[in-house]
Amino acid sequence: MNRHLTGKQKFAFGFGAIGKDAIFNIVSVFLMFYITDIVGLSPAFVGVMLFVARIWDAINDPIMGMIVDNTRNNFGKFKTWLVIGTLINAVVTVLLFTNFDLSQTAMYIYISIIYISWGMTYTMMDIPYWSWLPNLTHDPREREELSVIPRFFASLAAFTVGTFGLFFIHKLGDIFGGGSDSTGIFVFAIICSLIFIFTIGVTVFKVPEDQEMEKLIGIKVKFKDIGRILFKNKELLAIMGVLLTFNLCLQTLNGSIIYYFKYVVNAEHLFAIFNSMILCEMVGLLLLPRFIKWVGRTAAFNTSIICIISGLLIILISGYIAPQSMTLIIIGAGILRIGSGFMVGITTVSLADVIDYGEVKFGQRNESIITSTNTFLTKTSQAVAALIVGLGLSILGYTPNEAQSVVTINGLRIMILVSPLVFICLAAFLYHKAFNLKGDFLTDIEKTLQYKRQREFRERIK
C-alpha cells in the first residue's frame, strides 16, 4: 500500500516553503537589525526577549503538535492548521515590523508581545507543514527525493530575502517613505506576507492529504503522553541534539554576519554577496539524493561537516589576509552553503525516519508532536543565537552606526566565526555517537514498517 505523488504534487508541496521561509528569514535576518538600528532599542534586550520566548515555546510547540495530531475533520488535520496558522502569522509578521513611534518603554512591551505572538502563530503553521511530509510517501528513496524539494524552495526564499532584503528595504523606503528604512521594512513585510499566503494556498489546494492512513493510526494523544513521546524515543533525542547544534551554527552566523561585514571589514556590500551563496545550498540540496546513492548517507553527512568547517575557516582567514576580497567570500561561503544544503536535507529525512521508528517501536507515529521539536529547535537556536549576538554586542561595547574599537572588532570575529565552528563540531559528534538510524538498522526499520502496513491493510479489508 505504498503511496506515490505526481511530480506536480511534489512541486506544489515544496512551493509552500517559499512564502513560509520568506517570513522566517525576514525575522531571522532583519529583526535584530530592525530593533537596534531602526527602532533604537538595546541589542541585549532583543537577545533576552527571544530567549524568554523560547521558554514558552517549550510548552506551546508540543501542545500544538498534540492539537494537530488530534484534529479530525474532512478537510484534513494538516491542511486545517496550515491555513489557520498562515493567515494569522501573515498579519502578525506585518505588525512585528510596524513602527508606531511609541515611547521606548511602550516599544519594549509592544515588541515583546508581538514577537511571542509571532512565534506561536508560526508554530501553528510550521508544525502541520513538516508533519505532513512523512505521510506523503512511505517509500524511503522517494522520501529522500521529496524532502529535498521544500528545502530547495526554502533556500530560494532565504537567498532572495538575505541577498536582496537590504536593497528592497532601502528601495521601498525611498518609494513609500521618503528614504525611511522603517517604512521600507514595513512594506517589505507586507509583500512577504502576501507571497506567504499565496504559496501556502497552492500547497493546500494542490496536494492531497492521506486521511486513510490517519484513520489506521489515529490514536488520540493526551497531554500526559507528550513527555513519553518526546523523551522515551532515544533516536528523537539524538536528532534533536544534531538539529539544535546545526541550527545554532547557522543562526549565530546569519544573525551576526551583517555586523561583521559592516564594522569589521568595512564592506557592507559583501553581506549581499555572502547571502547570494545560498544558491550553492540549493545546488547541494539538488545533488544530495544522487550523492547519497553514490556514497551513502553517513558519508554524505561527513562531507557536509567538512564543507561547513572549511567554509568558515576560509571566511575567518580572509578577514585577516584580504578583508574586502569578494573572491574569498564567494569561495568560503559557497563551500559552506553546499555543506549546509547537504545537512538540511539529511536532517529533514532523518526526522521523518524517526517518525517511522516511533511507529515500529511504540505503535504510534505522532507526526506533529515529533515534528514540533524541529519547529521548537529552529526557534530556540534563533533565540540562543540572538542572545549570544545581543549580549555579545553589549559586552563588546558595540555602538550602532559608528566606528568600532579594536576590542569590539576582535570580539566580533570570535563571536561570528568561532562560535559556529564549535556548534558544528558538536553536531558531528552527536550524529556519530548518539544517532543510530543509519545503515542496516534503518533498513530493518523500513522492512518492519512495510510488513506492519501490509498486515494492517489486510486486516482492514477483511
Swiss-Prot record:
Membrane topology: Multi-pass membrane protein
Protein name (database record): Lactose permease
Chief location bin: membrane
Record has Transcription regulation as a keyword: no
Species, as recorded: Staphylococcus xylosus
Lineage, highest ranks first: Bacteria, Bacillati, Bacillota, Bacilli, Bacillales
Matching Pfam families: MFS_2
GO-annotated cellular components: plasma membrane
Any one of the GO BP annotations: sodium ion transport
Keyword Cell membrane included in the entry's annotation: yes
Any one GO MF annotation of this record: symporter activity
Extent of the signal sequence: none
Gene field: lacP
Function text: Responsible for transport of beta-galactosides into the cell, with the concomitant uptake of protons (symport system), and also for transport of homologous and heterologous exchange of beta-galactosides.
